[in-house]
Amino acid sequence: ATLSAADAKRVAVNFDRDDNVADGLTHGLYLRLRDLLPDRELVSAGDVVGRVRGIKSPTEHERIARAAETTASLLDGLAAAWTPSMTEADAVEWLHERMREAGYGSAWSWDYCPTVHAGGDADLGHTLPGDRTVPPGELLHVDFGVVRDGYAADIQRLWVRGEVDSGLRAAFEDVRAAIDAGHAALGPGAVGHEVDAAARAEL
């Protein structure tokens, strides 16, 4: 009744084509609103929801930091435990075991978190672990994150087995320059795609 009496011709509701976090309205409820408010234009409240969710309380900042610190600590532990005979599946199980012990959730699907790639011939993207080990001079890549206190982290790490050749060193320097450029573009009001573009411009 309150909304029907309002003068607003446009009503923002929680649907969004691009942001699933702001897309909470079911299609059925959307249709019901259309029936109840035939003279109103229903528009996405995605921008408003995004801005509100982007504001974090001190407690939320602490929980986000704790999730990131926990993830980084587990990755450090994996690096210390790693041996040349460790397979991708072994590395996944090492992290999963500690997550189960501590009661942490995975930042994305358990079967794919962590994602571990051993060597240059490994499949790319979020893949299931195999029996590959890291050949000398090649990389171990781990993409991993835990959920702790309701907040998720997402961290990637690369380690090299043995000596670092000039090609890997050059790639490392390029990526570091891109990260530095993205970091320099961060600040209040910064838009994600602009930060991303600043980083990619270095590659």
Q: Can you describe what each PLM-predicted range is?
A:
Residues A1-L203:
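Active-site neighborhoods and metal-handling regions in enzymes and metal-associated proteins
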